């Protein structure tokens, strides 16, 4: 089974930065995920601020597994696209300075057909961001879930000279009725990080719903075994998308669940 390296999504803890770091460390995590613009305003960090933040994180024996940069729209949305691309590049550059190997974003709804006009425009953006990642040293990771794994893989493979990673989100795949194993098979070694989430299909409601990690249909022992076959060495990120009354307990339970696999 692949080695379980756990990161905590700091935003889910709903605490100031230093307290969040202390709690993540107390849970037994080895890394964190920061939210650009929420946990820390990257654009306002000076060189001194970057050094201080890196030291603060290291003081808790943690590292940054990824930075989440959630744009209002994906790269499939033409309005304001140039600004989103430039902002993504800026975050990737600052992420490298902070020691983060990945910047995660939901890139938009990828068409299943490669001859779709939207596929072609998204492929051009992904190529641009992939080449930028090679230059700056931190890569964009496209989160799974809004399309099938094979559809996302076709987009990421459109330019063999530009690398964009994948952030596997099993819960979102379940909720949107896509196969997890299909996604792992299609994306392979591009999977650099896992958003440790879970879900079930609510047949009565005709839709999928999010549930706490370990309480849904995501088969994490099998997921980790499949990832091990593809030399996965990344982190599994635990934590709710938005902090709530139960988020701290859910994060702690999630860490314990993964450590007990």
What are these regions (language model features)?
Residues 9, 140-144, 215:
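Small/polar loops that bind or transfer phosphate-bearing groups
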